[in-house]
Amino acid sequence: MSLSQQLKQINEKSASVALDRKSRSKLHSKSLIFAPKVAATQDYDYLHSVGVDGLTELCTIDSRFLKFQQTLFADSTVNFDRNVQTKEIVDNLDASIAAFLNLVSPFYPLSPAVKAVEWLVRRFYINIHNSEALILTCLPHYQSQIFARVMNVIPKSSWPPIFNWLNGYRDMSKNPPSSSILKAFRNDYQLFKLYSEYITQQVSVETVYKEQLVFYLTNTIQLLASYSTDIEKLNEVYLPVILEVIGKFLLASNTSLDHDIKIAAYTLMSVVVSLVPLADDVHISLTRSILQVPGAFDPQLKRQTMIILAQTWQRYTGAKFDFEFFNTIPLDSLLKDNLLESLVHEGFDFNNFLLALISSTNDKRTLSLAKLFKIERANEAVATTFISRLIDAASFKPDTEARASIVAAFEAMLAGSRDTLVEYLGSKKEPMSLADLEMVLLTTLSSSDVDDSEINVAQSDEVQEANGSSNSEPVTLDGVKSHTKSFLFQCEDFNDLSRLLVSFLAPFESNSYANQIAKFCAAVFTGPNASITFTLRCSLTPIIPLKVRLACLICLKRKLKELAKSGDTKLHLILPILILGLYDDHQSIRAGFAESIHSLSTPSASKNASIFLEDEMYADVAASNKVLISPKDGDSLINLLTSTDSLLKETVLDKTRLVSVLFEVVFKAQQPSKKFGLVCQTFFIAQWSQLPFAAVFKSLIFKIMSGRNITAECPSRESFIKGDVAGLFSGYEAWMASAQESKLDFESDIVSPLVNLVGGQDELSTPNSSEIDEVGWLIKATDFTKCPVIQVAATKRVTQVFEFLKPEDKVRLYSKFIELQASDDELNFDAQEILQAMPLDFNSALTLLKNFQLVAQIPEQQIPKRRRRSSNSSKQTMAHEELVSIASVHLRKLTIVLDLLEYNLRKNLKEIKPELLSSFFGILTDLEYLGHDGDMPVLYTQEVLATCMLLAVKHIKAINENGSGRISIDSNSVRADLIVNTIRSSNSPQIQNRLLLVIAELASLAPEIILHSVMPIFTFMGAHTIRQDDEFSSFALQDTIAKVVPALAKSGASSFSNEIEFLLTSFVTAFQHIPRHRRVKLFSSLSKTLGAGNSIHTILFLSGVQYASLFGKGKHGDCLSLLEFTQGYMKQFQASEQLSAIHKFCTLWQLVPTKPLDPDSDEFRNLNSRPIFGASILSLNDTELVELKAGLITFIDSLLQTDEESVGYLQLRVNQLLLDSHSTDGEKTIIIDGCKNVASLLLGSLDNFGQVSKMTKVSDNLYQFLDDILSLLPLVYFLDSIIDVLKNPMGVDRVAINFARLAGNKIENELTASNLDEQIQFSLFEKLVPVLISGIKSNQDAEISQAYMDATAQAVAKLGNCTTCFNEAKNVSVLNECLSILTSESGLKSSKPECIISSMNCISSIINIMGVKAIGFFPKIFEPTVEIWKTTKTNEEDMQLVQTSVLLLFAQLVKKLPAFVTSKLDSIFTCTIGSLAVDATVRSSILSSIVEYVDTAYVLKALCNVWGEISKSDNAEVIGLYLGAMEKTIDQLEKKSAISQATLFIKWMIKAFEFRSSVSKSSQDFDTNTIHRLESSFHSCGLRYVMKLNDKTFRPLFAGLVRWAVNGEGSTSDTDEVSRYIAFFRFFNKVQEQLKSIITSYYSYLIDPVSSLLKRIDTMEDSINLKRMVFNSLTSSFKYDQDDFWSQPSRFESICGPLLQQIPTIENSIGKYLVKCVSAFVVNVSSEEHNEKLVHGLIHYISNEHSTTNSHTKTWTIRILKSVFQKMGDQWLSYLPTLIPYIAELLEDDDEDVELEVRKGLVKVLENVLGEPLDRYLN
């Protein structure tokens, strides 16, 4: 084991060991449940109780958790520490933890599981020691929150490397997506292998769960799919693992998830075999594994097993298909439920599997599955092999069942692909044709359609010997003898003889079949009669191979020719049988029978010739019932058929022509006698119907007769109805057996033709004593459950003959099928489909409805009630079980009838009468009783009835509108009250909606009936329908209103308006219950139906009342919802309609009283009669009425108000219409008049409310509403509408004030250079501005003057910005006049602050336009403004507004008149900086403007001038603004100006440096930080200014500063020396940092003062701070000295001594600054002479020889030496011998601190410089 591995093991074992409190707390804070801070404080007792609680709950879910109560969750584990346990105990612990995690894995999303795992995390640190198992068990829950928690509790040091791909999600505390899981599985084989092994282990220990299986399946399937393009890697790497998993899954015996595990295995196997081309032995191995799965063929798994077997064998490419393991398949289970058949039908390919199964097993039952082989899907090798296996099976004389299975298989192949089968048969080693195959199978293939070209049968009449035979063993006829005389009838031995014949012929070639048949007949039969009838029957029997049938036909023809030639026999009796052969499906058979008919002619027959087969055929027929024709007529009949070749040729080519030949030619022949045809028909029909022919003959007879019956009248069918049809019910089993023996299709060959004989194009017979009830027979047939085939055929026949039935028979059939549909019996046909196929006429419909109507008399119409109450007696009566059953059946039948009626009403019901409606209402009453009294489920029936009523009413309307007739509706036919009652009582919205649609349709058809119930309808719609959130309800509601309201209006009812108001009130009342997304559409369509003029204002008023109520209750969300709806609703209408509605709204608003009304007053009665007012408004008190009126105005005004970002919809429409050149004058007039009408009404209301104090809120809202109404108009129209009001304001005219403000706002917001035209300019300058100026001059009222001034300012500003009109002299004169007024008592000199503020605002706007043209007014403006500013200090009420206005005016003056304000800058600065009520950012901006626009030299001078006053301020913000302005001024100042103003600036700087001193002596209360910030600004100003000066200018100024600092020269205050030095060095140090070496020489002015200062500094106050600054100053000078300034001896001597003399007195707090200073000095003056002096100077302070030496001096001197040696290095090594004795002495100093300083500091540095220990030198 490597060292790294050993270290890793040690780390893992000690990962949960915490050696200090901090790490222990961090380790303990990892929790799945608690926050880290909470978890860190929890003890193990509490955590154990949490875990036990979780485990207890888990035990109730799964008892397997019980075993952990005594292990992991035992009480003793509270004190368990895994870090001190033995390896064996730890291993057992890990095993228990793994077992628990496996078991708890499915329950991770549950709280108990998290609690239990929490204990394991906190006590056993499974997040550290079992982190891999923890992640593995939790991985299927990667999308849940628990997975993120699990990742979070695992420390990075313990994170399993195999899960490093999760680190990113762990750090972000996010769940990984499924794509990341898949990517990890795909890119990391080891991870996939690990999880595969883990899940197989889970399966083996029975802890796997569904989610885990789904997780593994999902990712594995996607993994396989991703490698579909890299099969090689998939086979090498992943496939072995997956196959191993499949194998273990298949063998799993998990009791709970056995089925799911096997399904998972099947799924994986399915994907594998679909994607990967496996070797054949793998397919075989997989199959063997599947068949060994326990329970693979159990019912719940059998389907999946067969599917996977099919998929596995679908890819098998081997040649071997015989495997023993297929014998283990339980065939009984496989054949049960037709499973394979259904799977094949679903598209699964079982070809290879079927071949393997049939090849591997000897059980004949497997042959029954051969029919499922799909030859069209199979490859050639598989198909050929399969066909060969079947042929071999057929050749070994299989039993009947096996042969039938083989035949069924070939027939299925023929149906699937005939050409493919023929191709594969031809490709065999011994090629075969279909005819050969039929001979092998000893039967005819029903789908073979063998062509004549495939038949090689000798056609010669001469007897030929066989040319050869096949290798098959011939069949012997020894002992075979038949005594049957005729085979025309059903006989027992025919089937055996026919099979013997086919077997007898099998060894021979087909061209000798006829001769061999002759031999067979000669050997078996005793006479020609038997031979002829046998060959005849064989010729028409489908089960016999076609080759044999043709050969029999040849033999028959030979026999008939022989008899005809003999002349002793008349053959005409057999003619009807031979004619049947002309209806065979094969043309070759039909041709043979045609030739046989030609052979019947016996022209030389003797008169005494016998009639062939007469005795055999008619032996059981009484002589009186025999219907024969004479031999002569027989000859004539034969001659008729054979004389004209075309007759028989037609039937040979087309068998259907036989019907026409018989019924149109033969049966209507009039030669040799007129009744010859009738005689022939009688003969044929009698023989066909009387004689019990075999099924093969009867089938053809039925087909011929039914073919005639379907196409034309066929009275002769009656003979068959009495016989065969009547006996079908009793003899169907015999028919079925005969059909099966002959391979006839029982349905198509027997039943259908026979049933088609019932009924026809003539009326069906009615029951009487002599005739059969054909309708009754059909009814019985439809109910004949013993034979479903007869049922289905009868139902089809019913639909065919229905139109020829009598009305009463139609009703009988309707009733029968309704009964069948209503029954619970399983039917073999769709009764409803049959009912719909039988067209329903009006009379039948009416009869059916009456049959199912319970109440004979509809109850009388009464006053509508809320709901009909069910009586207890009725309920008790209906509670009987028998009655309930009867009622249920009745209801079911009634529903079927109504469904049928609905179908026919939609399709083809033409005639309709009011009686039908009457029946509907009777049924409606029935359903009410059944629903309420019987508690029956009548909802669907009611819905269908409502639909029928709706369709019927629509039909009647269509008839009336088409003019084809007029159907009148009266109260006997229509009962609106019943509809209303049903609507009210029903709980189904669908029924309610449909009945509302019925009401809608009846409204125009019978308005006088419906309108009596209109109020309850409206009430119901408002209370219920309007709340439904579906399209149908919405449509029903709108359609009802759309049709009822016009009818209501057309009726001319006086209460129309009240009813409309009632409707709208009910709708708006339910507003909150209407689905939000349907509100606008509903009410807009409602308004369009009612008419905009009749409804919009009412809806607005009712909405406003709701808004006021909601607002008063504080439901602002509902208020907002109501406003949103109303805005969307109003957008649906034209602008003129909206304005008209607003006007009408205001009219309604005026009707709302302001105080309660007297109930006896007319006004009260009038309002109370109107639904929109009513008691809800009239019952309010004074305060509530005022609130209502105010709320209504607020509501309507909210619809008009806009914001800065958008324009109101109505305003947009109004502007669009008025400004559009295409709009007509009439349209514009309507809009303008609409606004004026509303404005006039509001002005009138203002006159009423303006003087009433309690109506102030109402009047305020009215003013705002009036403003918003006028705002709708474009600017030009608006100005024209308000000019008159502005001209003559009366007193405090709120209207004029609002109009002026509104005008200003509209000008500000709407006027732009692009839309300013001459018309607007004229209105503004020629109309508005003069009126405003005149109003200001009149000085009537402060508020009016203020509004006029503001409007003037806005108008002038906009005009000045958008036009150049003020360049004209006449317009300038207007502004001059305005300025004159504004600077008079009406403006600046006014005593009213509001007028002063507005006047300054207006002056600013005018100056902005006029510029220097306003210079004449400058004195009139500036001085009063300054005086106004001064007054603000005494009048604090309006201080902020006035000061702001003053500053803004100053800013405008500075911008437009910069040259003229220079003399006033002092005042401007004082006012600006001193306006404390104005925000500092505003003042700063104005100061910046002054600096920008005015010459900076004047600005600097003014700033210096005002400093004296500014410095006295106790507001730091004021001084900060001043200094900010100073900095900006200096930045803008040119160098030339800076030099010229330098002396002034230095004087200002000296004053600024003295600021700290003056503050300390004054009452100014500044904290130290504030003073530091201000001084920093002083220094910043000084530095900025110095940077603009040259040396020539700055040097004398600097000398002056030095003199000020040293002597106080130029001081304006009695500042002490220390303060001056401190202020000076603060500034000078910053200058040094900026100018560096440039200013080093300036120290010549400071050497003597500094030297002197250092010598006496210890005696000064605040010496420490000053010392630090001096040291820093000297350090900077030494550091930046590049010209050996300090190396000059005099300078060195001046500073060296005073500097070293600071060592004894240096304070510890600033000692480091002295060290830096001295070391920098040494570095700077480095020369032998200077160094020698410095060394001895420093030795002085470490040598014990001097009395001044002490531990303090030694310590700081040592530190200086240390720093010097660090910087000088080798340069000072020459002085080491001088210093060594003193160092040695210091190392033995009595003061340990000194010794330590030397040993750890100086000695270390010296050794570093020397590169060797210092001990050698010390010794």
Swiss-Prot record:
GO MF entries: U3 snoRNA binding
Keyword entries, A-Z: Nucleus, Ribonucleoprotein, Ribosome biogenesis, rRNA processing
Gene Ontology cellular component list: 90S preribosome; preribosome, small subunit precursor; rDNA heterochromatin; small-subunit processome; t-UTP complex
HEAT repeats: 1779-1817
SMART domains (alphabetical): BP28CT
Gene3D superfamilies per record: Leucine-rich Repeat Variant (1.25.10.10)
Key word rRNA processing present: yes
GO biological process, one term: positive regulation of transcription by RNA polymerase I
Pfam families recorded: BP28CT, HEAT_HEATR1, U3snoRNP10
Subunit and partners: Component of the ribosomal small subunit (SSU) processome.
Role this protein plays: Involved in nucleolar processing of pre-18S ribosomal RNA. Involved in ribosome biosynthesis.
Family recorded in the similarity comment: Belongs to the HEATR1/UTP10 family.
Protein name: U3 small nucleolar RNA-associated protein 10
Organism this protein belongs to: Meyerozyma guilliermondii (strain ATCC 6260 / CBS 566 / DSM 6381 / JCM 1539 / NBRC 10279 / NRRL Y-324)
Encoding gene per record: UTP10
